[in-house]
């Protein structure tokens, strides 16, 4: 299996970091960039040198995906999870972090521990317990979002951070799907309490599990993404069931999925979704991480969150590329885009334990703002734009995307968001404004 250029660069930078003496390295790369393939490739190289590698993850679906990736690069391995008897004898083991934590006393020390979804790593967590049980092992953490729920970085467990490509770079190169973001409504969260860094689930359920909000989600799905495969991210299992029921009542093939289902039932629902027999899948967190189905074209956000990591993980489920897929539609009924910014917005991650992101200066991109037109798209405010034609009375970058092509002034008038210029490419971001003050054509 051939690596993409950015994957090869990231792998080399990880190896260089270890050679420089760092014992615990964090690799940051977007959802959909092929992180599993990258660390499987690293595992293959070490396995050829008879090194012991343990790859830990926290969900059954992740264990399966990791095993599939290892098979693709011809790595012999075993799986350690609930129901597994004894300790695997292969040099490479894919382990449930919770099962491994219970068997640490008898588990042989690995040379390398690889942690998928490493934003869960904290010293006092199960992940931290496993890592600290083997002080001589090197550690490679992999994540798209190197930030804890409380906004702090992962510097207490990692020595160095290797930055992979950005979402914007991969979108520009055609490795991720461009996204259109629509925010038809923003929920009133003034009464929602906060606990442990995020909204209290019971308060969110009371706010979001309403016919008016779900009805709006169904209506906008019909208008903007009718018939496309969608994932709806919900607040609770009850909320997910209610949302699925409303989509079914509207004539769509929908189903919910949750961790309480047995393995056979969950696999059956996912198989139907993959084949298109189910159009809309509703879930409470179960598919926020490690869910790999590139054919998903729509993300319906019905779960407000203060967690940037959770928001990016959810939005990232829908931006993988797939044959015939031209774009991703994000229907944000939760206000997450306005709170956290666009999925491909540049983020300056840092490893320090104080704050995982550098604070923006006044000259950097302000928060997302709603469009003033009827389209209900979301825009990102910018401080200055130098358009190819016309002058701006106030500048905006629209989240609509159009095929790269020349557009005349009379064509611009037909758009719900008036535009000033287009960055040409397979798909370009439209630089839009409220008022175009010059009549020059493009």
For the regions a language model picked out, list residue spans one by one.
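Conserved interdomain linker/interface between the two RecA-like ATPase lobes of SF2 helicase motors
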Residues: 161-234, 354-355
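Conserved Walker A/P-loop ATP-binding site and its immediately adjacent core
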Residues: 36-41, 45-72, 150, 237-238
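Post-DEXD/H (motif II) to motif III coupling segment of the RecA-like Helicase ATP-binding lobe
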Residues: 120-182
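Walker A/P-loop
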Residues: 20-43, 233, 257, 282
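Conserved pre-motif I regulatory segment
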Residues: 1-28
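Conserved helicase ATPase core of P-loop NTP-dependent helicases/translocases
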Residues: 64, 76-89, 239-288
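Conserved RecA-like P-loop NTPase helicase motor core
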Residues: 98-104, 259-266, 270-347
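A conserved SF2-helicase RecA2
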Residues: 163-177, 195, 322-372, 376, ...
């Amino acid at each position: 299996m051939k690596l993409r250029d950015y994957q090869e660069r990231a792998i080399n930078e990880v190896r260089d970091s270890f050679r420089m003496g760092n014992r615990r390295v964090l690799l940051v790369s977007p959802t959909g960039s092929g992180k599993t393939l990258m660390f499987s490739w690293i595992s293959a190289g070490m396995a050829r040198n008879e090194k012991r590698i343990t790859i830990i993850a926290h969900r059954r679906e992740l264990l399966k995906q990791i095993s599939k990736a290892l098979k693709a690069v011809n790595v012999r391995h075993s799986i350690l999870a609930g129901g597994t008897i004894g300790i695997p004898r292969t040099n490479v083991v894919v382990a449930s972090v919770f099962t491994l934590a219970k068997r640490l006393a008898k588990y042989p020390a690995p040379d390398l521990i690889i942690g998928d979804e490493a934003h869960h790593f904290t010293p006092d967590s199960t992940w931290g317990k496993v890592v600290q049980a083997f002080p001589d092992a090197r550690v490679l953490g992999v994540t798209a979002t190197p930030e804890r729920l409380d906004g702090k970085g992962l510097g207490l467990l990692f020595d160095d951070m290797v930055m992979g490509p950005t979402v914007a770079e991969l979108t520009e190169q055609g490795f991720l799907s461009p996204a259109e973001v629509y925010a038809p409504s923003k929920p009133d969260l003034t009464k929602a309490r906060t606990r442990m860094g995020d909204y209290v689930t019971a308060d969110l359920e009371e706010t979001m599990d309403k016919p008016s909000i779900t009805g709006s989600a169904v209506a906008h799905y019909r208008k903007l993404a009718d018939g496309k495969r969608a994932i709806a991210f919900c607040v609770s299992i009850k909320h997910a069931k209610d949302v699925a029921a409303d989509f079914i009542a509207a004539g769509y093939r929908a189903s919910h999925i949750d961790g309480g289902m047995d393995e056979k039932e969950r696999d059956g629902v996912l198989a139907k979704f993959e084949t298109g027999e189910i159009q809309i899948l509703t879930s409470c967190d179960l598919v926020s991480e490690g869910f790999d189905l590139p054919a998903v074209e729509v993300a319906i956000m019905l779960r407000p969150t203060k967690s940037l990591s959770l928001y990016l993980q959810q939005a990232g489920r829908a931006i993988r590329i797939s044959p015939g897929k031209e774009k991703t539609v994000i229907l944000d009924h939760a206000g997450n885009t306005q709170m956290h910014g666009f999925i491909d917005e540049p983020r300056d991650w840092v490893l320090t334990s104080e704050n995982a992101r550098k604070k923006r200066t006044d000259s950097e991109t302000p928060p997302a703002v709603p469009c003033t037109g009827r389209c209900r798209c979301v825009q990102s405010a910018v401080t200055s734009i130098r358009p190819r034609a016309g002058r701006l009375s106030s500048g905006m970058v629209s989240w609509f995307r159009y095929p790269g092509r020349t557009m005349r002034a009379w064509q611009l008038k037909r758009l719900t968001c008036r535009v000033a210029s287009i960055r040409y490419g397979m798909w370009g971001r439209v630089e839009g404004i409220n008022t175009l003050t010059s009549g020059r054509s493009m």
